[in-house]
A protein has these predicted regions:
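Residues that mark the N-terminal boundary/hinge immediately upstream of a DNA-recognition element
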Residues: 18, 75-76, 102-105
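DNA-binding alpha-helical recognition surfaces that contact promoter or target DNA
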Residues: 24, 65, 69, 92, ...
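DNA-contacting interfaces and partner/effector-binding or oligomerization modules
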Residues: 1-41
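DNA major-groove recognition helix of helix-turn-helix/homeodomain DNA-binding modules
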Residues: 102-120
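Residue-level detection of the helix-turn-helix DNA-binding "recognition helix"
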Residues: 95-97
Length: 120
C-alpha cells in the first residue's frame, strides 16, 4: 500500500496498491481539488515542497491556473477587453471544464500579459 499526500495542500490525500496506482490516484485527487478550488475562486497555493514525486495535472487545469495567476489583480473584464474578446469568452478560459483556447487566443493573451503560456 502506498499513500500520497501534498504538503502544500493538506486536504488532499490518497493511496494506491502499487506505486503507479498511487500516482494515478494522486493525479485524480489533485485535479479534483484544483477544479473545485478554481470553481470557487479560491487561491491555488504555489508548491514550495521540493522532495517527493511530481504529479502533473491536465493541460486544461494548468492553463486555467496560469491564466488566473497572470491576471493577478486585473479583472476578467479588463483582460477580456484588452485581448479583444467578450467577458464570457474570457471567463470560459479560466474554467478548466470549458477552456480550449485556440492558437489565436493564446497569441492575444501572450500579447496582453507579455508572456508565453504552457510551453508544451
Amino acid at each position: 500500500m502506498y499513500s500520497v499526500r501534498f504538503p502544500d495542500m493538506p486536504n488532499v490525500m490518497t493511496f494506491g496498491f502499487s506505486r503507479s496506482h498511487a500516482l494515478e490516484m494522486a493525479k485524480e485527487a489533485l485535479e479534483g481539488v484544483l477544479e473545485v478550488d478554481l470553481d470557487h475562486a479560491l487561491e491555488i497555493p504555489e508548491s514550495k515542497y521540493k522532495g517527493g514525486e511530481s504529479v502533473e495535472v491536465s493541460p486544461k487545469i494548468a492553463f486555467a491556473i496560469e491564466l488566473r495567476k497572470a491576471r493577478a489583480a486585473r479583472s476578467q473584464r479588463e483582460v477580456a477587453e484588452a485581448s479583444g474578446m467578450t467577458y464570457q469568452q474570457y471567463q470560459r478560459l479560466e474554467n478548466p471544464k470549458k477552456t480550449n483556447p485556440t492558437l489565436e487566443t493564446l497569441y492575444r493573451l501572450q500579447k496582453v500579459f507579455n508572456r508565453k503560456f504552457l510551453a508544451i
